[in-house]
C-alpha cells in the first residue's frame, strides 16, 4: 500500500497531498450543525419559559408564591371583609380559590415540561458536545496524517519506518472518521424521540388549559345563577331608557294621546308593563312584487303596506298586511327587506298620493289640446307612469292609478332565508 502511495505521490504536485473527507460526510456534518443550533435556541427559550411560569413574588404573608396564587389570596382575604350575602364577595372568593388551583396546575405543568422536554434537550446538547470533541480529534489526526504525507513526498528514498508511521496515521484517521460519522447519525436519529417528547409537551399544555378552563367555567356558571332576577331587571331598564330617549313617530302621536288619557282614568300609577305598549310600530311599503316560495313567506304586491312585528335578520322581516287606517288584514308572514321601504305616516303617504294624481291631471290640462273630460283617469304606459311619479318623489305604483295596462313586476335577488 505504501509503495503504491509513493508511486502516486511521485505523479502529484505538493499541494494535493491532503486527506479529503467524503461529500456525504460533509453534508451530514452541515445538517447536524443546523439541528444543534436550533435545539440550542429551543433549550434557552424553554428555560426562560419554565422560569417565568415558576417565578414567585412576595405575597401578603411575606411568603414567596406565584403571581396567580398571590392574586387568589388577596381576593379571598378581601371577600371575607364583605357581607356574607354579597354576590360580589361570593364570586370574588370563588375566583380567588380558582386562582390558587390554577397556580397548582401551573407548577405541575412547569415540572412536567422540565422533566420531559427540557432535560431531553439538555441530553441532546451533551451528545452534541461529545460529537464536537470527537470532531476535534478527527481534525488532529487528519493533520498528522497530512504532515506525514508531506514528509514522505519530500523524501527521495523509501523509508520503512516512515511507511509504518503513515500506515498507522491513516488507520487512526479512518477510525476517527468512522466514529464521528456514527455520532452524527445518532444525533440525526434522535428526531423520532424529539417528536415523541414534543407530543407529550403538547398534551401537558393542553391538559393545563383544559383544567384551568373547567375551573373558570364552573365559577362563571355559578355566578350566572346567583342573581338572574337582577340581570333581567337591569336589561329591562336599559331597554326602557333607550325607548324613552328615542323620538316618537308622528303617526303614533294620536294613539299615544288616547292611551295616555285612558291611563289617567285608572287609579293605578304608570308602571313598567304599560311602557312596553309605547314600543315603536314600524310600517313598510312594498316597492316590488314578491311571490312567497312557501307557506311562511308573505306574498307582496307593489304598494302593499305591512306592519313589521319582528326583524328576523338583516335581510328578512316578519309582519302583517294593513290598510291605510293601520287595520290588520289577516295576511302575515316573512318577506325580504330589500323589497320594501319604510314609511312613517300612513295619512301623509295617502295625501301625497292624492296630490300626485291632482298634479298629473293639472299638467294634462295644460299640455293637451284635446277637448275631453280632464277628470278622467290618466292612461299611460307603466314605464311612463313610474317615471312621472318618481319625479314627484312619490312611491306610487301603477296600481294606484287607473291605467289600462298591468303594473310592472320587478324582482330583486332574494336574500338567504334566516335560520328560524
From Swiss-Prot:
Which residue intervals make up region (Disordered)?
Answer: 398-420
What GO CC terms are in its UniProt record? cell division site; cytosol; nucleus
One molecular function GO term is: lipid binding
Q: Give the UniProt keywords, A-Z.
A: Cytoplasm, Meiosis, Nucleus, SH3 domain
Pfam families to which the protein is assigned, alphabetical: BAR, SH3_1
Q: Which residues form the BAR domain?
A: 10-232
Disulphide bridges, residue numbers: none
Residues forming the SH3 domain are 279-345
Annotated GO biological processes are: endocytosis; meiotic cell cycle
Q: What is this protein called?
A: Meiotically up-regulated gene 137 protein
Role this protein plays: Has a role in meiosis and sporulation.
Does Transport appear among the keywords?
no
Which organism does this record belong to?
Schizosaccharomyces pombe (strain 972 / ATCC 24843) (Fission yeast)
For this protein, the record's CDD domains field holds: BAR_MUG137_fungi, SH3
Localisation:
Cytoplasm; Nucleus
Principal place of residence? cytoplasm
Q: Which InterPro entries match?
A: AH/BAR_dom_sf (IPR027267), BAR_dom (IPR004148), SH3-like_dom_sf (IPR036028), SH3_domain (IPR001452), STAM (IPR050670)
Amino acid at each position: 500500500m505504501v509503495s503504491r502511495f509513493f508511486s502516486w505521490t511521485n505523479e502529484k504536485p505538493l499541494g494535493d497531498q491532503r486527506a479529503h473527507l467524503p461529500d456525504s460526510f460533509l453534508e451530514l456534518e452541515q445538517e447536524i450543525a443546523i439541528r444543534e443550533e436550533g435545539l440550542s435556541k429551543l433549550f434557552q427559550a424553554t428555560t426562560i419559559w419554565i422560569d417565568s411560569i415558576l417565578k414567585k413574588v412576595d405575597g401578603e404573608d411575606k411568603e414567596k408564591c406565584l403571581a396567580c396564587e398571590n392574586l387568589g389570596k388577596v381576593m379571598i382575604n378581601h371577600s371575607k371583609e364583605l357581607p356574607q350575602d354579597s354576590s360580589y364577595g361570593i364570586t370574588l372568593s370563588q375566583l380567588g380559590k380558582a386562582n390558587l388551583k390554577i397556580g397548582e396546575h401551573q407548577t405541575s405543568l412547569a415540572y412536567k415540561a422540565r422533566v420531559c422536554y427540557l432535560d431531553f434537550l439538555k441530553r441532546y446538547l451533551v451528545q452534541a458536545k461529545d460529537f464536537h470533541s470527537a470532531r476535534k480529534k478527527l481534525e488532529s489526526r487528519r493533520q498528522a496524517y497530512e504532515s506525514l504525507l508531506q514528509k514522505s513526498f519530500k523524501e527521495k528514498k523509501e523509508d520503512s519506518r516512515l511507511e509504518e508511521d503513515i500506515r498507522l496515521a491513516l488507520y487512526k484517521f479512518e477510525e476517527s472518521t468512522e466514529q464521528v460519522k456514527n455520532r452524527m447519525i445518532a444525533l440525526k436519529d434522535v428526531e423520532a424521540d424529539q417528536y415523541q417528547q414534543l407530543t407529550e409537551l403538547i398534551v401537558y399544555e393542553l391538559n393545563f388549559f383544559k383544567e384551568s378552563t373547567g375551573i373558570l367555567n364552573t365559577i362563571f356558571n355559578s355566578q350566572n345563577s346567583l342573581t338572574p332576577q337582577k340581570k333581567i331587571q337591569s336589561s329591562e331598564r336599559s331597554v326602557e331608557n333607550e325607548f324613552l330617549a328615542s323620538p316618537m313617530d308622528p303617526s303614533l302621536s294620536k294613539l299615544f294621546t288616547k292611551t295616555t288619557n285612558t291611563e289617567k282614568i285608572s287609579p293605578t300609577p304608570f308602571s313598567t308593563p304599560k311602557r312596553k305598549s309605547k314600543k315603536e310600530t314600524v310600517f313598510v311599503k312594498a316597492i316590488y312584487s314578491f311571490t312567497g316560495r312557501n307557506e311562511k313567506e308573505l306574498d307582496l304586491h307593489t304598494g302593499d303596506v305591512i306592519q313589521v312585528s319582528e326583524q328576523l335578520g338583516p335581510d328578512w322581516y316578519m309582519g302583517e298586511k294593513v290598510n291605510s287606517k293601520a287595520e290588520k288584514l289577516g295576511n302575515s308572514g316573512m318577506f325580504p327587506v330589500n323589497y320594501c321601504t319604510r314609511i312613517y305616516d300612513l295619512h301623509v303617504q295617502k295625501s301625497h298620493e292624492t296630490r300626485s294624481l291632482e298634479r298629473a291631471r293639472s299638467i294634462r290640462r295644460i299640455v293637451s289640446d284635446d277637448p275631453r273630460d280632464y277628470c278622467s283617469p290618466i292612461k299611460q304606459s307603466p314605464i311612463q307612469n313610474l317615471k312621472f311619479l318618481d319625479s314627484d318623489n312619490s312611491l306610487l305604483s301603477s296600481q294606484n292609478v287607473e291605467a289600462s295596462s298591468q303594473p310592472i313586476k320587478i324582482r330583486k335577488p332574494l336574500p338567504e332565508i334566516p335560520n328560524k
